[in-house]
Amino acid sequence: MQQIMSCGVAVYPDFEIPGEMERTCAYLRSARALGYGEVFTSLHIPERDVSGVLGELAALGEFVHRCGMEFTLDASGNVMNGFLDDPEKFALLREIPMDWLRMDFGFDPESIRRMVGMLSLKGLMCNASMLSAEEVRELVRMTEAWDGLKLRAHHNFYPRPETGLSMEFLCAKSKPYLPYDIPVTACIPGFQNPRQPLFAGLPTVERHRRMCAGDAAAELKKTGLISSVLIGDPFAGEGELEEVAEVCLGKPVTLRVQTEAEISEQERKILFGGLHHTRPDCPETALRSQSSRGMAAIGTAILPRENGGRRRFDITIDNEKYCRYSGELQLLLQDLPADPRVNVAAHVLPEDWGKVCRILPGTDFRLTEES
């Protein structure tokens, strides 16, 4: 069974800008239509007075709920303690229909207890990038006392280039949550509208800063440690939204291919006759279609053809010389030598090579023919 991750988007609205509310709502509708389930925003807005944004966040949260999405607010302990000490401001904060409060830094157990008692929350998010394994255990013990309150972990994003985490560090910091079944979220950048003031993307992992959103999401999915992906930059492009949803929600990846001139009708049926489900135990050299041999079993024999060497991104089909493997389709991930038992049937178009890394073992892909 393939892993399914949830996905979310971030917005940092300034509704004093003409048309900002309409633009934000349109963006959230588009995200929801693609399967996104969470909206993230932050009180870390040094450019604006914090108290001035509370009414805007309340309006935003209400719209998020009307869309059927969850609303997450990110704040520091210093900011939240300021609200706790100011009844008037805290009353405004309570008007925000937030589901999750992400505790960034500066929180102490007493302030957490006070907030939980005064806010109607679905749960808390801890800072997955910062806590040690012992701190995770302490937090779990503390939150167990609050019946019904859920706990999630959410990694930082890093606006400044060269400050993001390595994949190894991300995995090390994510593993302590596994024994408690605590979901972990990581962030990826969006390139269409990188967030001010640095405009350098908002990834958790540094090498994702210049990686397209779908590829970054696929790399996080491969770890088996990340349960949710958040596009940290606001107003991601439609293509970015689609490719991240495709990866996270397990939607089939579509690859355009050009066929060899001499392929048989039976080979064509195997190529384009339906979805290809990859085996969960694929080798490093290729993605093996688990469903292709079933397609071949009901058709005519696949005769050998003359082939040169097999190249990365070729689509091959085993012929009758491979006996019971006849009909198996493979998408090559490495160059391989020619084999008289294997027909080269098609080639993935160069424009789609980047999408191949999003096809993980146990997931689906579809081939379409380009003339």
Predicted regions and their residues:
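Active-site mouth loops of central-metabolism enzymes
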Residues: 3-24, 73-84, 102-104, 130, ...
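Catalytic domains of carbohydrate-active enzymes, especially glycoside hydrolases
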Residues: 22-45, 95-100
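Catalytic alpha/beta core domains of metabolic enzymes, predominantly
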Residues: 127-263, 270
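Catalytic beta/alpha-barrel core
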Residues: 40-42, 72-78, 98-109, 123-134, ...
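Glycine-rich, proline-tolerant flexible connector loops at the mouths of alpha/beta enzymes
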Residues: 37-60
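C-terminal functional modules
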Residues: 260-371
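Short, acidic/polar
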Residues: 18-31, 83-92, 112, 136-139, ...
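Short, well-ordered coil/turn segments that N-cap beta-strands
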Residues: 3-9, 35-37, 65-71, 96-99, ...
